[in-house]
Amino acid sequence: MVVPGSQDDTAFPAQGRGAAVLAYLLAALIGLILAAVLFTPTVLLGTGPFWDAPNYPDMQQHLSAARYFLHDSWRFPVFLTRLIMPPDGVSVVFLDVNPLLALFAKIWFKLTGFTVNYFGPWIALCYALQGTAFLFLCRSLGLRGVVPAVVCAVIALSVPEFLYRYFHLNLLGQFLITIQLGLYFRAVRGDRYRAMSWWALGLALITILIHFYLFAIVAGIYAALLAEYALRARGEIRTVLVHGAIFVIGTIALLVASGYLHGAGGSTGFGYFSMNILSPFVPQDS
């Protein structure tokens, strides 16, 4: 994962692009091996009996909403389906279908007539990128070497909040947060604000179409990057304002187009799914 616009992976001394690629591939391989140990091949391919009737309510919601969305007509907002809660319908962004992948799957279905369960490959992708993204962050802080790549992958793949998210599929995409942190530190430590700001801006907007929880964190990191940019990169306030305006306009446009502002919900679960002192350490039971 060499960021275009950077100087040989970062602005810091590097072992060379080949060594960087090898380190990233190794981190991704470790993640895929762990995924293969924890899940059967059919689960990772999105096929087999597991996906016919998952035991987890969240997964049932993901799958059923995705199927309704794929088989419905094209509408606006883009992710609106009237096959759920007719006649008004609902935007499936609220049903955790991973809107970006759902959009590609719907295009494929309309063109070919074949449905694709993208949740299985998504699990494999998240496991591959979990360690890779953490390595990207560590390299942004100056870490180099093959052994550190292995250590980074193992640490990232051992995080309880990641391992316990497999039943809430979209929140497996924690690599988005880690990559954004890596871009932030490359901007700050390497004094490459403009290049990294563009990449961080794009990542933040893409994350809207994956999960809004992740977007809130990724967008917060991007806001911090812009603040650093404004304070340190003198003479480029206009660029900072342009990037900020693009981010705000892009965010509003995506929220409207995807259906985040469509309809209204209730407060079911408020106060029940709450935060307490054990949650960061034992999130599945607190």
Protein language model regions, located:
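Membrane-water interface at transmembrane helix exits
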Residues: A35, F39, L70, A105, ...
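Membrane-interface starts of transmembrane alpha-helices
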Residues: A19, A23, K110-W122, R144-C152
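Membrane-interface coil-to-helix junctions
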Residues: L34-L129, S158-V159, L163, H168-G173, ...
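Periplasmic/ER-lumenal interhelical loops and adjacent helix-loop junctions
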Residues: G250-S286
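Alpha-helical transmembrane segments of multipass membrane proteins
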Residues: I30-L38, V159, T207, G250-L255
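Start-transfer (signal-anchor) and selected internal transmembrane alpha helices
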Residues: M1-L45, V242-I246
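Membrane-interface helix-loop-helix junctions at transmembrane boundaries of multi-pass membrane enzymes
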Residues: R232-V242
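Membrane-embedded helix bundles of polyisoprenyl
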Residues: I123-L141, G145-A230, H243-F247
